Amino acid sequence: MKELQTVLKNHFAIEFTDKNLLETAFTHTSYANEHRLLKISHNERLEFLGDAVLQLLISEYLYKKYPKKPEGDLSKLRAMIVREESLAGFARDCQFDQFIKLGKGEEKSGGRNRDTILGDAFEAFLGALLLDKDVAKVKEFIYQVMIPKVEAGEFEMITDYKTHLQELLQVNGDVAIRYQVISETGPAHDKVFDVEVLVEGKSIGQGQGRSKKLAEQEAAKNAVEKGLDSCI
């Protein structure tokens, strides 16, 4: 945990008073289960707490940032920001993936790169930070790590292209729409996916992203921007 403490101190000006709390935040259930005799705590309860404070702070930010957006739009945007895939991305940005304690089986099966484990650890860290410090420190961290990407429009950009494309294509009846990965490049922790969207077997758009879902949205956007004439 010393390396993690160094990362937190150097990059985020965070120093935990309760080191055990920090360690618990990065302990997956699989690790605790493999060391039952040691009665090690895992991070599920902290994840529960972190999820709650994250929802609150992101809701407050969006409410103040977008005074004219209706509740439905705010809810959709919040959902995009706090979804599993997004939180996993933030965890990787913070190098948290390097410090999660996993059981041998989970490690061998690729758990260190699994979005659900990374997202849970990110929320657990927020919960631990809340308990060790206060909500103001959690807010400071969120505004340093998450909000810049929100303000860059990363989450609004991907909100609805797949749905929009589906609505355009299926206005006159059902149409078979399929997304497929063309290629994957880069190391496991920083992959780039190339995806194409096909309608009735015909490729109508391509996109690239750091996850399959982001690449699919880019492919749908590409198809929408081309216009329906090229899609059918």
Curated annotation (Swiss-Prot):
It is found in: Cytoplasm. Its cofactor is Mg(2+). GO terms for molecular function: double-stranded RNA binding; metal ion binding; ribonuclease III activity; rRNA binding. Its EC number is 3.1.26.3. Gene3D superfamilies: 3.30.160.20, Ribonuclease III domain. GO terms for cellular component: cytoplasm. SUPFAM superfamilies: dsRNA-binding domain-like, RNase III domain-like. It is an enzyme of class 3 (hydrolase). One of its GO terms (biological process) is regulation of gene expression. It catalyses: Endonucleolytic cleavage to 5'-phosphomonoester. The active site is at D51, E123. The keyword rRNA processing applies. Residues 160-229 form the DRBM domain. Mg(2+) binds at E47, D120, E123. Transmembrane segments: none annotated. Residues 5-134 form the RNase III domain. Keywords: Cytoplasm, Endonuclease, Hydrolase, Magnesium, Metal-binding, mRNA processing, Nuclease, RNA-binding, rRNA processing, rRNA-binding, tRNA processing. Homodimer. Belongs to the ribonuclease III family. Digests double-stranded RNA. Involved in the processing of primary rRNA transcript to yield the immediate precursors to the large and small rRNAs (23S and 16S). Processes some mRNAs, and tRNAs when they are encoded in the rRNA operon. Processes pre-crRNA and tracrRNA of type II CRISPR loci if present in the organism. This is Ribonuclease 3. It comes from Streptococcus pneumoniae (strain Taiwan19F-14). The lineage of its organism: Bacteria, Bacillati, Bacillota, Bacilli, Lactobacillales. The gene is rnc.
